[in-house]
């Protein structure tokens, strides 16, 4: 291990790919500074009731994930034992970067081990806490299908061209107040057309050990088309009942079978030329709740980038969210961001990037009334009683490995 540490340090200093003695290093990081039009710290725009926000020029934290994996054993027959761990760091804008307390944290979101054996047909056995088969939309950081957690399973066993997976987990995330056993079944690589394949996921949540708990389930189906306009396209349908309303995660354990949610997503990402790329999202989610708590979320947004040179891009993003509720009418939020950007390459997904940005947003009274006190949309937030506001700032974003 001492030799490995020396090699790792040398490669970091030399800017070389970080793999040595079976060790791999990957990660993600973003950080910067932002201010609001009134002179205070940047305050970010998210519609109450919407599970995500369009994030270009609309992120209010320093955040990093640092992941390392070490091959503990590699046999000539393909047997491989691997240990994987990740540290995440979070700190809100406007506060000292201590990564502790009310405005920051340091966590260990992943620590797990996997064993790959020839008999598993390309699959592996695993146990621990990990990110598991996560699906997300990049432009609003929406993890619409995320059965991650602490548990064990069999991943990607190949059978007749398909991949079969099973996972048992007890906890989705650190914020989950109550625990319940969750079983996730996944079938992938169901080829439908050249470059296109289906993936099915069924989640079953057992009745939790809390008062008035219920069991529930969810079903997710995704069609992914590769090489679509130089990128890819995703079409997703999800449905959940009871605690399955988490739609890929665990929802409220007290939700009964009359509580339901469904969601539809369409999201193409393109790179039409080496200079012009982008991503679009159209989403619809319906939540049926007891006691007049039904709501419907509509979302549409697009981010586009055009590279004027090898290292300079102009990036723009427009997003609109609407939440219709029975209790307090329809909430609306629209935002626009323009961001001159320096990058290592002209592609839409090329990173690192350094961006200057200007973001403008508008919302209605219903959104203001529903907003948490002190948040951007509230009457006690950075923009007072106004129904619009703007931010400026600079941000760096990068990812590597993985």
Q: At which residue positions do the language-model features occur?
A:
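Surface-exposed coil loops of outer-membrane beta-barrel proteins
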Residues: 32-56, 95-109, 119-211, 373-385
């Amino acid at each position: 291990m001492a030799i490995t540490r020396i090699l790792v340090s040398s490669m970091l200093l030399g800017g070389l790919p970080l793999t040595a003695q079976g060790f791999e290093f990957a990660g993600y990081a973003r950080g910067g500074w932002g201010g609001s039009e009134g002179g205070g710290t940047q305050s970010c725009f998210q519609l109450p009731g919407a599970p995500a926000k369009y994030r270009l020029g609309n992120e209010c934290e320093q955040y990093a994930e640092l992941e390392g994996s070490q091959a503990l054993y590699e046999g000539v027959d393909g047997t491989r034992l691997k240990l994987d761990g990740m540290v995440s760091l979070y700190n809100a804008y406007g506060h000292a970067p201590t990564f502790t307390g009310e405005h920051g944290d340091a966590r260990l979101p992943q620590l797990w081990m996997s064993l790959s054996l020839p008999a598993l047909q390309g699959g592996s056995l695993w146990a621990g806490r990990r990110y598991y088969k996560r699906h997300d939309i990049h432009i609003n950081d929406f993890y619409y299908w995320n059965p991650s957690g602490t548990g064990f399973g069999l991943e990607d066993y190949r059978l007749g061209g398909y991949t079969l997976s099973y996972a048992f987990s007890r906890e989705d995330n650190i914020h989950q107040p109550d625990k319940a056993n969750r079983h996730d079944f996944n079938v992938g690589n169901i080829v439908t057309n050249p470059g296109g394949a289906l993936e099915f996921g069924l989640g079953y949540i057992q009745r939790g050990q809390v008062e008035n708990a219920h069991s529930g389930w969810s079903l997710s189906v995704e069609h992914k088309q590769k090489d679509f306009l130089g990128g890819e396209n995703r079409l997703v349908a999800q449905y959940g009942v009871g605690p399955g309303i988490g739609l890929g995660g665990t929802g409220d354990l007290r939700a009964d079978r009359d509580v339901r949610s469904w969601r539809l997503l369409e999201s193409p990402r393109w790179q039409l030329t080496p200079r012009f790329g982008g991503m679009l999202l159209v989403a619809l989610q319906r939540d049926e709740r007891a006691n007049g708590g039904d709501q419907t979320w509509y979302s549409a947004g697009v981010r586009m980038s055009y590279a004027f040179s090898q290292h300079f891009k102009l990036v723009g993003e427009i997003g609109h969210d609407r939440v219709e509720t029975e209790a307090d009418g329809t909430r609306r939020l629209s935002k626009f961001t323009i961001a001159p950007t320096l990058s290592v390459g002209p592609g839409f997904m090329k990173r690192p990037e350094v961006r200057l940005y200007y973001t403008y947003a508008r919302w209605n009274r219903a959104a203001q009334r529903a907003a948490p006190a002190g948040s951007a949309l509230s009457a006690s937030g950075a923009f007072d009683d106004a129904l619009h506001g703007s931010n400026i700032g600079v941000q760096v974003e990068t990812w590597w490995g993985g």
